[in-house]
Amino acid sequence: MLSAADNLVRIINAVFLIISIGLISGLIGTQTKHSSRVNFCMFAAVYGLVTDSLYGFLANFWTSLTYPAILLVLDFLNFIFTFVAATALAVGIRCHSCKNKTYLEQNKIIQGSSSRCHQSQAAVAFFYFSCFLFLIKVTVATMGMMQNGGFGSNTGFSRRRARRQMGIPTISQV
């Protein structure tokens, strides 16, 4: 079972990713031209939601899924995907004022719409929020692996290693 703090971060991140999916689906639904950046943003949000929230939900019921190495790899991939999606969308829209008519007309993602401008800027913000949460989770998972090992055993740099039993046995050992 995962810790309460880990579950709380997963819930907050799921909310950010659901909001991002809503914003990106609004962009996809109103587009007149194909945009690979917007499509990648949708992939990154759905992948993050499935691997983070669904895997976390299942790991709470099946403890065999709570391997720190698997959690670290999934969190790292989610960090990379959300960072790349946020950066690609931010570079694509250039984040100018949504009242600038020349900017609205010349941008291939915004396509002349003020509402698409606001949606894309909000999506960038929520992707970066999610990216930051994944970075925190990668850091915590790395520290957990260093203490407890990659598969939950005490093979890491743990200070809590079992002491060698030497000498006369105590009453609890008899």
From Swiss-Prot:
Main location: membrane
UniProt topological domain (Extracellular) ranges: 29-41, 91-122
Gene induction: By ketoconazole. the promoter contains a sterol regulatory element motif, which has been identified as a UPC2-binding site.
Cytoplasmic side: 1-7, 63-69, 144-174
Single GO cellular component term: eisosome
Disulfide bond annotation, renumbered to this chain: none
Pfam families: MARVEL
Membrane topology: Multi-pass membrane protein
Keywords from the UniProt entry: Cell membrane, Membrane, Protein transport, Transmembrane, Transmembrane helix, Transport
Alphabetical list of InterPro entries matching this protein: Marvel (IPR008253), NCE102-like (IPR052649)
PANTHER family in the record: NON-CLASSICAL EXPORT PROTEIN 2-RELATED (PTHR28165:SF1)
Similarity comment: family membership: Belongs to the NCE102 family.
Functional description taken from the UniProt entry: Involved in membrane organization. Required for the formation of membrane compartments of CAN1 (MCCs), localization of CAN1 at the MCCs and subsequent invagination of the plasma membrane at the MCCs sites. Involved in eisosome organization and might act as a sensor of sphingolipids that regulates plasma membrane function. Involved in a novel pathway of export of proteins that lack a cleavable signal sequence. Non-classical export pathway also functions as an alternative clearance/detoxification pathway to eliminate damaged material, when the basic repair pathway is not sufficient.
Protein name: Non-classical export protein 2 homolog 1
Lineage of the species this protein comes from: Eukaryota, Fungi, Dikarya, Ascomycota, Saccharomycotina
Gene, per the UniProt record: FHN1
